[in-house]
Amino acid sequence: MRLIAALLSVLLIASTAQSTVTIYESSKPGDFDFYLFVQQWIYSYCDSQTCIQNKEREAFTIHGLWPENSDGSYPSFCSGPSFNVNAIQDLEDQLNFDWPSLTGPNTDFWTHEFSKHGTCSITGPITDIHDYFATGIKLYTEFNITAALESENIYPSDSNTYKPVDITNAITTHFGGKPGIQCSSGQLSTVAVCIDKNSLSIMDCPDLQGWSCSGSVKFPSTA
């Protein structure tokens, strides 16, 4: 009986763990459904992290351009070229401002993002390392989240709170595609727009695992 109970306990733990684990998928480059173009609000991020002070400002910055599947799985660390900073030398000044690491060297962050996500993105209009980062910059210019929110009177504030549905609707109205949003400690922290992998145009995001906010949230103006 003691052995049976132990086995049942192990099975229960395994079953519970399996039900909460995010699906990860290793695959070949280009084998995914769409991109998530992810931007993070600096002050929300730096509220829970020790950020480099001169990088803090009132802005969204690029977190990444991530291949994604409709079922919540995603490819990562695909075979392909290794990150080489020389390939993006002409983009560095803009990347330093638009796609910075807030906690460490920018090149370390770019290496991680390309190794994990960029290697799987080499498909269609994105053919190499330079294309990957240039596309991120282009999308950042095109999808100005702060402007979208301000067009619906949603401004950074340490006192005001906003309904997540109003944030989502503001972005949808401005750009024509339903986004995903994430919150941390009651603050808007991350916004993702979904991008067609062939045309690089915005599309409605499907229901994304882990992308939701509840209650009223802040859009902080300080960390």
Swiss-Prot record:
pH dependence: Optimum pH is 5.0.
Assigned keywords, A-Z: Disulfide bond, Endonuclease, Glycoprotein, Hydrolase, Lyase, Lysosome, Nuclease, Signal
Gene Ontology MF annotations: ribonuclease T2 activity; RNA binding; RNA endonuclease activity
Intrachain S-S bonds: C46-C51, C78-C120, C183-C213, C194-C205
Gene3D superfamilies xrefs: Ribonuclease T2-like
Catalytic activity: a ribonucleotidyl-ribonucleotide-RNA + H2O = a 3'-end 3'-phospho-ribonucleotide-RNA + a 5'-end dephospho-ribonucleoside-RNA + H(+)
Broad class of enzyme this protein falls into: lyase
PROSITE patterns named among the record's database cross-references: RNASE_T2_1 (PS00530), RNASE_T2_2 (PS00531)
Keyword Lipoprotein found: no
Transmembrane segments: none
Protein known as: Ribonuclease DdI
